């Protein structure tokens, strides 16, 4: 039987409509139980507890995402599969933790099987379910009712509206906790060290600068030929000029090109005669993004890294910073 494109679109729109209705109903039902759930988590977090999230099937998939969102927004959390918990993983849960148990029906046999041990630990249980009279709800400290009467699935079988509601409720909890803890952009960066924001807010110059034998350095009495060899060897595009490791100047490949264009080029001249004195530098404690901004401002491709006495500690290059994708 041929199905028209219009039918596909109508089915999609109907799915959106049903799930949006579910979310509207959930939004309008948020009450003091949501407040209690947040307070339970915040109170236990003061004792460095974790939020343990469990759920079976599609609820479990949503639970994994919920745990990941909690963990990345300042609430330590991880997912425990209820089936595996019954075969050893229950040992991951401690008496200081808080459990969020997800079951739309509130009767998941795997979660029911864990209730005696959870009660034995005497840890707070937050139930997420559409059945406030279920065994799970009756054994919980607080129940967050999803209020899902019908799935978007026309068979009313595949978890659709219920999983969407659970996902959004989890996000609502995470954001409420984030705001309660005054979780900042910098805090977020620490939990995302490999992301662009993390690198921007965490990486310092000392973390990415070239050190030791990687630093191109010549003495002021060395000739231009020696400087050219140093530039070629270190591949930075310039060489620092230093006396007893104190920064005096810099000689770049741009300086070299301009000298070649002059009629009186002499590779035996002392580098001190042609170097740029008092070059731009930066402290190792500065942020990497600051080094990038400084290079862009002065239209240069590297910065000497020095201490308060102008002693050379390293060199940071535009090329290295671009590879970090700080923006």
Swiss-Prot record:
Zn(2+) binds at residue 81. Substrate binds at residues 74-75, 81, 87, 113-122, 147-149, 221, 273. Its EC number is 5.3.1.13. CDD domains: CBS_pair_SIS_assoc, SIS_Kpsf. It catalyses: D-arabinose 5-phosphate = D-ribulose 5-phosphate. Keywords: Carbohydrate metabolism, CBS domain, Isomerase, Lipopolysaccharide biosynthesis, Metal-binding, Repeat, Zinc. It comes from the Bacteria. PROSITE patterns: CBS, SIS. GO terms for molecular function: arabinose-5-phosphate isomerase activity; carbohydrate derivative binding; metal ion binding. GO terms for biological process: lipopolysaccharide biosynthetic process. Gene3D superfamilies: CBS-domain (3.10.580.10), Glucose-6-phosphate isomerase like protein, domain 1 (3.40.50.10490). Pathway: Carbohydrate biosynthesis; 3-deoxy-D-manno-octulosonate biosynthesis; 3-deoxy-D-manno-octulosonate from D-ribulose 5-phosphate: step 1/3; Bacterial outer membrane biogenesis; lipopolysaccharide biosynthesis. Inhibited by hydroxamates, mimicking the putative enediol reaction intermediate. Most potent inhibition, with an IC(50) of 0.7 uM, is obtained with the 4 carbon-based hydroxamate containing acetyl moieties. The record marks 58, 110, 151, 192 as: Catalytically relevant. It is an enzyme of class 5 (isomerase). InterPro entries: CBS_dom, CBS_dom_sf, GutQ/KpsF_isomerases, KdsD/KpsF-type, SIS_dom, SIS_dom_sf, SIS_Kpsf. Belongs to the SIS family. GutQ/KpsF subfamily. Homotetramer. This is Arabinose 5-phosphate isomerase KdsD.
């Amino acid at each position: 039987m041929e199905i028209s494109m219009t039918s596909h679109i109508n089915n999609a729109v109907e799915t959106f409509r049903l799930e949006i209705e579910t979310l509207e109903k959930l939004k309008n039902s948020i009450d003091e139980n949501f407040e209690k759930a947040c307070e339970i988590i915040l109170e236990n977090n003061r004792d460095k507890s974790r939020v343990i999230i469990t759920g079976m099937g599609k609820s479990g998939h949503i639970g994994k995402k919920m745990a990941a969102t909690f963990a990345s927004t300042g609430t330590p959390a991880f997912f425990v599969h209820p089936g595996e918990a019954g075969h050893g993983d229950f040992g991951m849960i401690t008496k200081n933790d808080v459990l969020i148990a997800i079951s739309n029906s509130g009767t998941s046999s795997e979660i029911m099987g864990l209730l005696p041990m959870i009660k034995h630990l005497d840890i707070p249980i937050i139930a997420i379910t559409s059945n406030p009279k279920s065994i799970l709800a009756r054994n919980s400290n607080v129940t967050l009712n999803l209020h899902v009467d019908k799935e978007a699935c026309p068979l009313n079988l595949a978890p659709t509206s219920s999983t969407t509601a659970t996902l959004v409720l989890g996000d609502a909890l995470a954001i409420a906790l984030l705001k309660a803890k005054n979780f900042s952009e910098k805090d977020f960066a620490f939990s995302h060290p490999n992301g662009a924001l993390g690198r921007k807010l965490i990486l310092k110059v000392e973390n990415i600068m070239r050190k030791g034998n990687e630093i191109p350095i010549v003495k002021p009495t060395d000739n231009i030929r020696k400087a050219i060899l140093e530039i070629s060897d270190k591949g930075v595009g310039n060489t620092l000029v230093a006396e007893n490791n104190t920064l005096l100047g810099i000689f770049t490949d741009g300086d070299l090109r301009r000298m070649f264009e002059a009629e009186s080029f002499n590779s035996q001249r002392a580098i001190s005669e042609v170097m740029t004195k008092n070059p731009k530098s930066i402290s190792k404690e500065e942020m990497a993004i600051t080094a990038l901004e400084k290079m862009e401002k002065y239209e240069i491709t590297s910065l000497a890294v020095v201490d308060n006495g102008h002693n050379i500690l390293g060199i940071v290059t535009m090329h290295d910073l671009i590879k970090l994708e700080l923006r």
